[in-house]
Amino acid sequence: MTVFVTGASSGFGAAVARRFAADGTRVVASARRTDRLADLAAELGSSVHAVELDVTDADAITRVVAELPDEFADIDVLVNNAGLALGLEPAQRSDLTDWDRMIDTNCKGLVHVTRAILPGMVERGRGHVVNLGSVAGTYPYPGGNAYGATKAFVHQFSLNLRSDLHGTGVRVTSIEPGMADTEFSTVRFSGDETLADAVYEGMRPLTADDVADTIHWAATRPEHVNINVIELMPTAQSFAAFQVARG
């Protein structure tokens, strides 16, 4: 089996690469940060093919997929993990550049990678597309605005993709985590570790390994089983009450 992972240089992506490589699965680990990828490849050995890829570059996606070595060329599982959140300001004060970057990465990047790899899966009559969504796509919160909307897109795209692929043998799963302690909050707050650490203060969040284990489980079900959606949260997280303005 061969697994293609985007955003594999850290967080969920690196954990997914490690989890599948532990089974002897071939892994194409793609990301922008080549130094991190080199370390991952050195750690995991010959079962990993590391390749530089910015999912916002459509031409690069086409080139990378076309130039995969023969032993990594037939992708069985695509894990669309690359994504980010930027800022937590209300919509009227949000930076449009941040919104554009989230849409370009979380939505357009995901569909471009999917479109590049999907024809091979359909031709072979097997495959699995695993998309990383978020509970933010279902449950709104102040400052979530564009980020939550991009993850709602991932959820709906996954369902429609499943409908399109009915009868092809290709499966589709949306994995939708809640609070997880990765670089997510550090990126959201532009490297401010104090703000990032405060997000998880006093509670036990999910880990990257928790999410990687969930993805691995979904992707290794028998071929007649399709896991449509998995929503997972830390036990300490639940659903916020509706907001009410008083006075």
Protein language model regions, located:
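Conserved glycine-rich cofactor-binding loop
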Residues: 9-10
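Conserved glycine-rich Rossmann-like NAD(P)H-binding loop of the short-chain dehydrogenase/reductase
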Residues: 23-39
